[in-house]
Amino acid sequence: MSTQAGGRLVRREGYRVIPDKNIYIPPSISPEAKALLGALGQAKTYAMEFPAPDDVVGWEKMYEVAEGANKEKSEKALAASGATVTELEMGGVVVEDIRPHGWTDNGKVLVYVHGGGYCLFSARSTFADAAPMAAATGLRMVSVNYTPAPRARFDVIQRQIVAVFDALIDEGYRMSDLAILGDSAGGAMSASTVLNLRDQGKGMPAAAVLWSPNTDLTSPDDSTVTLDPADPILTYSTLLTTGAKAYAGDVALDDPRVSPLYADLSRGFSPVLIVVGTKEMLLSSSVRFYQALEAAGQTAKLDVYEGMWHVFPQYDLPESRVAVAKSAKFVTDHLNQ
């Protein structure tokens, strides 16, 4: 898409211009990452105009637009992976049951909670995000098609994810046979799921992997402000705020039910790997959650990548392949203990 006309930015329907974005391309990242970052930086000159947090009809229209935009990418990833994907209902919740190419049943399952600012995308349209971990782990993956906000608020969405775990337990799995992966908003919801399972006395998954999690909806913390101009994916004044409010509804944004950073982590948490890049606004969110977990005596690892951006493991980059391999090893090591 062209972002300029006669040397000036032009308005596009449904978008607003962000004149202060300055996407620096560091020499320290791979050539592949440099090329993609350049393309992302050009596209980020514009930001989509999102509906008000309580505008259900407006968000449904936006949801359909996002689904259509992601459809081809998801279908290509599915075809390239050779995985088998079946739509099922588990605990009253629709899921995509992913069996990677060459899958053999080892009695373990990785549950995936997709991102999308709490309001966008589905389990089907985010297959490209799930595919790398399916291939790297060789595990059966169950991607949860939760109801997006504001059609559902945080409590309904979290109950849906817990219901999928309950259904897996009913199938005969133990909690120690299960792990959870989430990215962005899905990373925050994955953390909340661990806490909900713990608080309901159901145990906790053997491992949790969180890619670029949004653990504190109150923001702005340091990187939310300082990295806003440099982030090629997120903009604080758009989805990062409106999506959070749509998800939380009438609940305060610092409520631990929506911001897991403020939860009582001393009572337990799954062994967790947090993956984040230095070029994303949620860097502070990841660092702070890691420090809170460590201070509470939990097993936590923070894996930070030079020059990488929001949920970078989903891309086909050298840095992404390293992050996915380490994420997969973390999951399989803990599932096999």
Regions found by a protein language model. Give the residues of each.
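Short beta-strand/loop motif that positions the catalytic acidic residue
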Residues: 268, 274-276
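A glycine/proline-hinged amphipathic helix-loop "lid/cap" segment
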Residues: 1-103
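Hydrolase active-site cap/lid region
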Residues: 195-254
